A protein has these predicted regions:
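N-terminal, positively charged, Ser/Thr/Ala/Gly-biased leader segments
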Residues: 1-28
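C-terminal membrane-associated helical module and adjoining short loops/tails
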Residues: 2-12, 142, 148-287
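Membrane-embedded alpha-helical segments that form the functional core of polytopic membrane enzymes
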Residues: 24-63, 95-103, 109-123, 161-173, ...
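Multi-pass membrane catalytic core of lipid/isoprenoid biosynthesis enzymes
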Residues: 47-48, 65-120, 135-138, 142-146, ...
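Divalent metal-coordination and catalytic microenvironments
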Residues: 15, 64, 256
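Helix-loop junctions at the membrane-solvent interface of multi-pass transporters
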Residues: 32-33, 104-105, 125-126, 150-151, ...
Length: 287
């Protein structure tokens, strides 16, 4: 029983499941911006996206096995908790399951899913050797939003694309900060500019009677960002990992900012996903 529990935790750590609520949040936002639609179709698409995310995370560790052996020996593969061959199999298995779930969603969904998988594999393969790999990570989240929108009633619209680009900006800033997590070098301030992209888009697209709500939400999201950034930039006890974990959970707030229509149900759904992301981080590391 203990061995099974240990192996299950290993699988959860490999899949970085504490970030799965942010995948669900991306899916919910993309689907809402595309006009919503059939709930069953949305749930299947969200499950497929979860499979693609988890598969990508498994393969991330598989690609990094040699690096982790020297620099992160506590990770599941170098610590001996699981064999690298098993991680490769799990990773491609999750990717295959995710793609299989999307075969009935139409051409645009299949194209977005395939492009997402390509971006995932490219990121996993080069992120340790390519200085601009955060851009590739942003591309992954970009196509995730488009994939979710392709399951909606209106499909991929201009607003969906702009929202996906704004989320990509946030991911770029977050990812560049995350690169400082395992180093002693001070974190740079310039990624904060990218974190602000969703705030700027929200203020641009929400005019008239929607502006006040946008300002309030931007203020709340901005406060959370500053709280997280304090751990990396200004605190006397520097903790980049805590900053990055908080910003990862903050992806849900970015989605709320983009897609909330004022509905209590929609708002409470995003709030629940934000709470889940923070809760999951107590048990499984987010990075």
């Amino acid at each position: 029983m203990a061995a099974a529990t240990t192996y299950l935790r290993t699988l959860l750590v490999l899949g970085r499941v504490s970030n799965v609520p942010t995948v669900w949040s991306n899916c919910f936002a993309g689907w809402l911006l595309a006009g919503g639609g059939d709930g069953g179709r949305f749930l299947l698409m969200a499950f497929a996206a979860t499979c693609l995310y988890v598969g990508g995370m498994y393969l991330n560790d598989a690609f990094d096995a040699s690096f982790d052996l020297q620099h992160r020996p506590e990770r599941p593969i170098p610590s001996g908790a699981i064999r690298v061959e098993a991680v490769w199999a799990w990773g491609f298995g999750w990717l295959g399951l995710g793609l299989a779930c999307l075969f009935g969603f139409g051409q645009s969904a299949i194209i977005c899913a395939l492009l997402l998988v390509v971006a995932i594999l490219v990121y996993d393969a080069i992120h340790k050797i390519f200085a601009l790999s955060p851009l590739v990570m942003a591309v992954c989240r970009f196509f995730l939003i488009l994939l979710a929108a392709s399951a909606g009633r209106d499909g991929i619209t201009g607003l969906v694309i702009w929202t996906a680009l704004a989320l990509g900006g946030y991911i770029v800033g977050l990812s560049f900060l995350a690169r400082k997590e395992s180093t002693l070098a001070p974190a740079s301030h310039w990624p904060c500019l990218f974190l602000a992209v969703p705030l700027m888009l929200a203020l641009i697209v929400n005019q008239g009677g929607y502006l006040l709500r946008a300002v309030v939400l931007c203020t709340l999201v901005g406060i959370w960002m500053l709280r997280c950034l304090n751990f990396a930039l200004w605190s006397t006890q520097r903790n980049v990992g805590r900053c990055v974990s908080g910003l990862l959970a903050g992806i849900v707030l970015v989605d709320l900012l983009a897609a909330w229509d004022g509905s209590p149900l929609t708002g409470s759904t995003f709030a629940a996903l934000f709470g889940l992301a923070l809760l999951f981080q107590r048990f499984v590391p987010a990075t």
